[in-house]
Amino acid sequence: MQRAARPLVSVSDLDADKAAALKLIPIPSALEARLDAYVALLQQWQAKTNLVAPSTLPQLWTRHVADSLQLVSLMPHARRWLDFGSGGGFPGVVLACAMADVGGHVTLVERIAKKAAFLREALRVAGAPGTVVLADIGDNVDRFPQALDCITARAVAPLHQLIGFAEPLMTPGITKALFLKGQDVDAELTESTKYWKFQPKLHASLTGGQGWIVEIDHIERRT
C-alpha cells in the first residue's frame, strides 16, 4: 500500500503563523483568499522543487508572505511593479495578489525555468495580475517594462549589483526601488557607495529580526 506524503508543515503550525502574520498586516478577505491559494500551491511544489528554505516553512506566512506584503504600504500608489529574481514568488507573487483589486500588474523576472513555471502557475491559481519573464536579471533589459513605479528584489544579489540592474529601468521622480536586506545591510550600503551615488532610506522590517528595506529613488553611477 502506498502511503500518503507527509505534510511539510503541520496545519496547526501554519494556521498559527498565518494568524500572527495577519495581525501584523491586516488584509481584505479577497486578498487573503488569493494568498491562501498561492501558499497551498507553494507547499505542493516545495515537495519536488526547492522554492524556499525548508527550515522557514513553519513561518511561511510571517517570514515570507508578511515580509513581502509590507512593501505595498511603502508604495501605496504604485501599480507597475517589477521583481528581480522572483524564485518562489517573494515578493513578486504576493505583490501581484495585492494588485488584483487595484488594477496593478507585476513583472516577475526569473532565470530558472522550473521556478518560472511555478510562478506562472501561482499567478494563474491565485488570480493575480502578472507576467513572468524567463531571463537573467542582468540581461535583456529591453524585455522588461520601461514605465515602472517600483522595482523590488529579495535574497537575490548584493545591493550594489541590484542597484546596477535597476538603474537603467528607473525614471527619475517616478520609479523607486525597494530591496529587502538582512543583517549585513550596512556593509552592503558601504560597498555600494563605491560604485553608485544614491541617498537610501532604511525601513526596519515589520516582521522583526534583522531585516531591513532599502528604499532608493535616484541613482547615479560614479565615474
From Swiss-Prot:
Keywords: Cytoplasm, Methyltransferase, rRNA processing, S-adenosyl-L-methionine, Transferase. GO terms for molecular function: rRNA (guanine-N7-)-methyltransferase activity. It is an enzyme of class 2 (transferase). InterPro entries: rRNA_ssu_MeTfrase_G, SAM-dependent_MTases_sf. Its main location: cytoplasm. Coiled coil: none annotated. Pfam families: GidB (PF02527). S-adenosyl-L-methionine binds at residues 85, 90, 154. PANTHER family: S-ADENOSYL-L-METHIONINE-DEPENDENT METHYLTRANSFERASES SUPERFAMILY PROTEIN. Belongs to the methyltransferase superfamily. RNA methyltransferase RsmG family. Specifically methylates the N7 position of guanine in position 527 of 16S rRNA. HAMAP family: 16SrRNA_methyltr_G (MF_00074). This is Ribosomal RNA small subunit methyltransferase G. It comes from Rhodopseudomonas palustris (strain TIE-1).
